[in-house]
């Protein structure tokens, strides 16, 4: 069994971003994070709203860094996306931007790690 880790949901619960890191620290080493999707929110239940990655409760770089160092080897994708004018119903433009953002974070972390070892 494993957890579909909704990073945005953990962030919007009371405790905010701390919930994300607690979950990574607990489930990551146990290899129970099998799939993760990332969205950002500002605020917590009952008053929160979805926002673009990097504009909300958590630092996306820190989350991806901790995921990569926890033993997570599953899928990491964007989740719900904020709408922008001129985009299609499914938010293709924002999904593309979120995917590029996440990929950029992963590449930056990998390059940073390679520089440490050089």
Describe the function of each predicted region:
Residues 1-118:
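Histidine-acidic metal/acid-base catalytic patches
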């Amino acid at each position: 069994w494993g957890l579909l880790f909704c990073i945005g949901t953990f962030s919007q619960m009371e405790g905010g971003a701390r919930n994300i890191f607690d979950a990574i620290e607990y489930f990551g080493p146990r290899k129970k994070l099998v799939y993760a999707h990332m969205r950002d929110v500002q605020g917590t239940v009952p008053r929160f709203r979805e926002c673009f990655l990097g504009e909300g409760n958590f630092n996306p770089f820190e989350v991806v860094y901790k995921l990569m160092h926890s033993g997570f080897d599953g899928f990491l994708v964007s989740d719900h996306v904020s709408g922008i004018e001129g985009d299609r119903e499914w938010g293709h433009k924002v999904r593309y931007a979120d995917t590029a953002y996440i990929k950029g974070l992963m590449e930056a972390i990998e390059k940073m790690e390679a520089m440490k070892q050089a």
